[in-house]
Swiss-Prot record:
Protein name: Small ribosomal subunit protein bS16
Family designation: Belongs to the bacterial ribosomal protein bS16 family.
Classification via InterPro entries: Ribosomal_bS16 (IPR000307), Ribosomal_bS16_CS (IPR020592), Ribosomal_bS16_dom_sf (IPR023803)
Alphabetical list of PANTHER family matching this protein: 30S RIBOSOMAL PROTEIN S16 (PTHR12919), SMALL RIBOSOMAL SUBUNIT PROTEIN BS16M (PTHR12919:SF20)
Length: 82
């Protein structure tokens, strides 16, 4: 099963995240299938860059976003609250 989830990048105490598509059982920082965006919670306001076409493509292929990624997608207006 594919998941759309976050993987951590950045320096210690300064997190930044990639939004990736990967197998559900793979480790957090393992290789990934596709990079669909980035998320930086340290900026004010938070910076979220998401490729909507890629996200919708992978959701169409059966990828499930994690709760955090689903919140980011909803906030960006890419998916509905369903």
């Amino acid at each position: 099963m594919l998941k759309i989830r976050l993987t951590r990048i950045g320096a210690p105490k300064k997190p930044c995240y990639r939004i990736i598509v990967t197998e559900a059982r793979s480790p957090r920082d393992a290789t990934y299938t596709d990079l669909v965006g980035t998320y930086n919670p340290m900026t004010n306001p938070e910076t979220v860059i998401i490729n909507a076409e890629k996200v919708l493509y992978w959701i169409g292929k059966g990828a499930q976003p994690t709760d955090t990624v689903a919140r980011l997608l909803k906030k960006a207006g890419i998916v509905n609250s369903n």
